[in-house]
């Protein structure tokens, strides 16, 4: 169900981009292997209980976290209550998690203890928003920065 809803929400990201990536990966065995592994991973989806699905949809629609109206165990969850350092990675071309949805969160944090990294994409990742986890460029460029930040932020 989640795959179908994702496709309906963004055919560019969940259909056309993955076919483009498959084509571009065809001549590179390592890229094609990663592409196929990500595709296989997408097939591991379990049915989400309907009550959980309704809650998730409400969270997205109402944007309660950003509005400061999300309550968890009697506590308000909001950017203004985040006290830990934050590292965010954005893909400038993503319509799944666009920078315009991440940057307002960072700007709403109570202090400037955050860093924003940019992921410029890869071939062989099937789904662009998964690239920061599976892509070769992400492993070569981003992850050393992320791990260094984690060591420093402690």
Regions found by a protein language model. Give the residues of each.
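Short beta-strand/loop motif that positions the catalytic acidic residue
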Residues: 82, 88-90, 94
